[in-house]
């Protein structure tokens, strides 16, 4: 058994222990909650180390076996793309288990059940990314959907709560139906369920089939992303679920959909039509603008963060669309930069969204509310949480020195490069409009950040906050790790690029943080030799 097998087997074993032991032996175990948390932390560390090693060493780990009948093939593979998203899953799961240790007080059965399910939920998230065939992928995808549905309803049994939970379940299964259709079409064309047989099918499939696959993947994974108009489950689910559950859903679960889109568009389909890229850009800007407009209007921190997720997933879609556009024009260096933006913002969003929900959880444990009308002057009683929340909303609003600023800069740079490359005046006008709308989205995000931080933490302290304390060290550790990560990612993006450079190079060309200059071709109007450098070049 090699190094990777030991680590990922350890991840599986610790997860199973964290799920089954506290649940089955609750009455005989006084510390069932502690066992669930410790197992979750151990499993996350194993997955984190394994995924990091695969990514840095540019290696591939794979395993295949058979269970019950031959069609149920356990095909597991970790390439650079899977390793990157496994890093997100395991790092945020690690933070979440640390936070949950402080958030769920007592050894009562309800807390033990929730933590046991969180272990299983974390396994399903990893399973989606580890799967190397369509059947196993759909199995873990459905497992992820059902467990998240149960966890969302965990604290609420009212008719309205059930209705909102079922809305989430319906939309997520609508997405599953389209993903299943895409995999069925791939099976009909290849006669295989293995992902290895789907690689670069864009070179052999006809145009109609490719377009159907593109649309099915976008709707299927878009439902989980929460892009417009499939975003309606976000405020409903986020408003219902326990904070520790929603923190994991918002930071990690929707990234499995980003992974799915990357796997389909860059791995399976390979070649792309020009309209795909522009359609993704248009879908992304609509989602981003609609999401941030609704986010700014909210007077509840949970709902603000829910709608801002639609905005941030829109940003990722725009970057993905730009990568496809540049790839269509065979501008691999520009496509590489756009793809890097997808990866960077995926990690950035996972960090700050997890941080903000955890900060919200800290507030909720003290005041039992996240309505802005009931929150005032919390910085006087919760200075540590105030600093952490400020760091989170600064990254959300793309303000330096945090990672969000780098994400915004990279996106704007991608759009400027597309503007200089295009010669069609209509397309250039559309890019200019997109640039303006992206800047508008950024401005509205700043307004939302100021509103939520200003109302909750500044001003006169509300009477209910007079007894607030910040003595929970589990909260401080989880918040501090995420703030430090956002700051390091914002100050040293070149190190992040060094880690994911092999992944970018697998699809396009390597990026250099020392001397990368992108030359706009002669066809780009009067600008023949305009050199644009990365901000860390």
What would you call each of these model-derived segments?
Residues 142:
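Short phosphate-coordinating micro-motif centered on Lys-Gly-acidic
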Residues 2-10, 74-88, 127-139, 275-276, ...:
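Membrane-entry segments of alpha-helical transmembrane domains in multi-pass membrane proteins
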Residues 76-90, 207-222, 425-442, 518-537:
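Hydrophobic alpha-helical transmembrane segments
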Residues 61-70, 196-201, 410-425, 496-527:
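Membrane-interfacial helical/loop segments at transmembrane boundaries in membrane proteins
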Residues 95-112, 118-137, 147-470:
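Hydrophobic transmembrane alpha-helices and their helix-loop junctions in integral membrane proteins
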Residues 1-9, 18-116, 192-203, 502, ...:
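Transmembrane helix-loop-helix hairpins at membrane boundaries of multipass inner-membrane proteins
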Residues 377-387, 441-537:
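Cytoplasmic/organellar membrane-interface segments at the starts of transmembrane helices
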Residues 38-52, 173-183, 389-401, 478-500:
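Hydrophobic alpha-helical membrane-insertion segments
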């Amino acid at each position: 058994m090699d190094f990777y097998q030991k680590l990922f087997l350890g991840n599986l074993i610790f997860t199973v222990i964290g799920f089954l032991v506290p649940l089955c032996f609750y009455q005989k175990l006084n510390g069932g909650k502690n066992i669930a948390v410790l197992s979750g932390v151990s499993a996350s560390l194993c997955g984190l180390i394994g995924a990091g090693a695969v990514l840095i060493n540019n290696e591939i780990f794979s395993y295949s076996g058979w269970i019950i009948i031959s069609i149920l093939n356990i095909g597991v593979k970790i390439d650079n793309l899977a390793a990157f998203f496994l890093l997100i899953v395991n790092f945020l799961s690690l933070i979440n288990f640390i936070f949950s240790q402080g958030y769920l007080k007592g050894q009562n059965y309800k807390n033990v059940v929730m933590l046991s399910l969180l272990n299983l939920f974390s396994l399903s998230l990893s399973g989606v990314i580890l799967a190397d065939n369509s059947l196993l992928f759909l199995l873990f995808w459905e497992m992820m959907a059902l467990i998240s549905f149960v966890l969302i309803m965990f604290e609420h049994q009212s008719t309205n709560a059930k209705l909102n939970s079922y809305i989430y379940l319906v939309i997520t299964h609508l997405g599953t139906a389209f993903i299943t259709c895409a995999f069925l079409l791939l099976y009909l064309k290849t006669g295989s369920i293995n992902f290895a047989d789907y690689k670069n099918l864009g070179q052999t499939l006809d145009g109609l089939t490719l377009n159907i696959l593109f649309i099915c993947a976008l709707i299927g994974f878009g439902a989980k992303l929460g892009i417009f108009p499939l975003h309606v489950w976000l405020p409903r689910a986020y408003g219902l679920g326990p904070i520790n559950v929603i923190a994991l859903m918002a930071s990690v679960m929707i990234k499995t959909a980003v992974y799915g889109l990357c796997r389909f568009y860059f791995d399976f389909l390979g070649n792309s039509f020009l309209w795909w890229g522009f359609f993704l850009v248009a879908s992304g800007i609509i989602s981003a603008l609609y999401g941030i407009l609704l986010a700014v209007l909210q007077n509840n921190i949970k709902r603000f963060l829910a709608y801002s997720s639609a905005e941030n997933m829109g940003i990722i879609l725009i970057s993905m669309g730009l990568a496809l556009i540049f790839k269509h024009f065979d501008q691999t260096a520009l496509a590489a930069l756009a793809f890097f933006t997808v990866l960077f913002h995926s990690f950035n969003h996972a960090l700050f969204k997890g941080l903000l929900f955890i900060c919200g959880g800290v507030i909720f444990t003290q005041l039992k509310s996240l309505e802005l009308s009931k929150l005032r002057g919390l910085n006087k009683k919760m200075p540590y949480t105030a600093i952490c929340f400020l760091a989170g909303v600064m990254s959300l609003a793309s303000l330096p020195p945090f990672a969000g600023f780098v994400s915004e800069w990279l996106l704007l740079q991608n759009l400027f490069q597309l503007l200089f490359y295009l010669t069609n005046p209509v397309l250039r006008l559309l890019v200019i409009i997109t640039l303006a709308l992206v800047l508008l989205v950024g401005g509205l995000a700043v307004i939302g950040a100021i509103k939520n931080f200003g109302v909750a933490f500044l001003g006169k302290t509300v009477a209910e906050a007079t007894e607030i304390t910040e003595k929970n060290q589990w909260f401080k550790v989880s918040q501090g790790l995420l703030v430090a990560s956002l700051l390091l990612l914002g100050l040293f993006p070149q190190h992040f690029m060094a880690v994911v450079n092999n992944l970018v190079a697998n699809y396009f060309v390597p990026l250099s943080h020392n001397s990368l200059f992108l030359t706009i071709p002669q066809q780009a109007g009067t600008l023949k030799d305009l050199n644009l450098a990365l901000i860390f070049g």
